[in-house]
Curated annotation (Swiss-Prot):
GO terms for molecular function: chloride transmembrane transporter activity; monoatomic ion channel activity. It is found in: Cell membrane. PANTHER family: CHLORIDE CHANNEL PROTEIN CLC-E, ION-TRANSPORT PROTEIN YFEO-RELATED. Keywords: Cell membrane, Ion channel, Ion transport, Membrane, Transmembrane, Transmembrane helix, Transport. NCBIfam families: PRK03655.1. The lineage of its organism: Bacteria, Pseudomonadati, Pseudomonadota, Gammaproteobacteria, Enterobacterales. This is Putative ion-transport protein YfeO. It comes from Shigella boydii serotype 18 (strain CDC 3083-94 / BS512).
Amino acid sequence: MLHPRARTMLLLSLPAVAIGIASSLILIVVMKIASVLQNLLWQRLPGTLGIAQDSPLWIIGVLTLTGIAVGLVIRFSQGHAGPDPACEPLIGAPVPPSALPGLIVALILGLAGGVSLGPEHPIMTVNIALAVAIGARLLPRVNRMEWTILASAGTIGALFGTPVAAALIFSQTLNGSSEVPLWDRLFAPLMAAAAGALTTGLFFHPHFSLPIAHYGQMEMTDILSGAIVAAIAIAAGMVAVWCLPRLHAMMNQMKNPVLVLGIGGFILGILGVIGGPVSLFKGLDEMQQMVANQAFSTSDYFLLAVIKLAALVVAAASGFRGGRIFPAVFVGVALGLMLHEHVPAVPAAITVSCAILGIVLVVTRDGWLSLFMAAVVVPNTTLLPLLCIVMLPAWLLLAGKPMMMVNRPKQQPPHDNV
């Protein structure tokens, strides 16, 4: 016979697995539709019209029209496409289900149109809202927070293709009760994360790891080098943190989301022309292209890092529906490659992983997630002790500093000005 603790853990196992699978399927469907639309906008249409895919007019035109289209969705859809991600954490309160169709359409348009944001925040919002709404009907005795945790874990597992990230993140948020062991509380979320990761793996495998030269043995000088790299990445990220609320306030003085997002799309188009096609989209596939291109110089990497960071700030400030983690990873990779090219004596594995750690820490203010992203992009067990040590001064630098989030004015409606 099972112990009562085991029976308690098993109560939410089936719902956890179902939520994990559903979270992954929603992500897969959204990404597939966005991929088809992206291929139409950036491959087939330019070819049919006889226009180069990297034509400045095409890049500016597509991104401007994408901004106008997203603005129309936010302006006229029920629920106004959910909350403004610039004002929300990654895991937030559930939104009304009526806002989800507009949010999904706005996300797909942004992903396909080349906006420098990832899918993580909108997908998380959709999955939490559905889990809470459906779960409250089927099992009303289970509180909303439980459904929120399961949906968040399932989504994290689906996004990163592994339950490890969910285990790390929730180990710090669920350890609030001394009476219930941590792993008892982690059981159902890890079931959801594992189900989400396995379901994603059946259809595609997220490619985070980069072909970077293997790092051999850690030396004391490497710790100092890594700490300096992380500090440089943090400094770059804090510039974006300073700019975001100010640009957000300036853009939203216009009140009309169609105008705001149209202008935002136009600015993104100009940035895309300067940075080239590799600086567009969420950044995961593009960072693979960046590493594979041996022709890039130190100045090229610097330009890509600056352009991508600026595009991230503009996209978030304009109200595009998307997340900030994936483009931040691209910025970290570009910064790391730039620093390695500038100082070849420091291995690329150190510069890239520590730059990712620093910039993701600025964006998420989550130490475990930052370590995870650095470790999966540069998969090398020798780096893990170094990353853990470098995390300490990085965390000290950010203690008490503002987050990359906009404080929503009290008079503003919950789903944007309209």
